[in-house]
Amino acid sequence: MKLSKSLEDSLKKDELSNLAVNIGEVGIDAILDNGVLRDTPITSSIFGGINAIGSVRDALFTKKLVSFLSELSDIPVEQRRSMIDSIDNSDDYKVKVGEKLIYIIEKAEDHYTSKVIAIFFSELLVGEITYNQFLKISRIIDSMFIGDF
């Protein structure tokens, strides 16, 4: 799956700090026109589809992805690579990190929920929680009312 590989590539790059824009104050059009997003593997893959299809759903998904990725910018790139590679190389998990994150982020209600999920993914990356705990927390967040945050 090309999209999940693009997400993993984005997570393993150092440019996540460039995504730290105030998503709440920026419209979807402004997000997609930003050159930084075009240079990020995952968003450039989606952006190509948006241009071809013009899908609002894809644009909203991109906004959730940008919100998720921008939350991870403080985690050192080597730490991100190490954790993702260890999960991907484990026999315990059948779905690679990138693909699983696509499923999780796609199900997120909005970009704010995606940001909350990213906070817990950060905890996974620094070793504060396990991958299974992250997956359980993500499922709980998915079923919560956004006003509960």
What are these regions (language model features)?
Residues 4-14, 89-101, 128-135:
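Charged, low-complexity, helix/coiled-coil-prone segments
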Residues 35, 54, 76, 145-148:
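Flexible interhelical turns and helix-capping residues at alpha-helix boundaries
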Residues 4-67:
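Membrane-inserting effector segments that mediate pore formation, membrane fusion
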Residues 103, 107, 111-149:
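Long, helix-rich, hydrophobic modules that act as membrane-proximal anchors or helical bundle/coiled-coil regulators
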Residues 44-121:
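Eukaryotic partner-binding/assembly regions in large regulatory complexes
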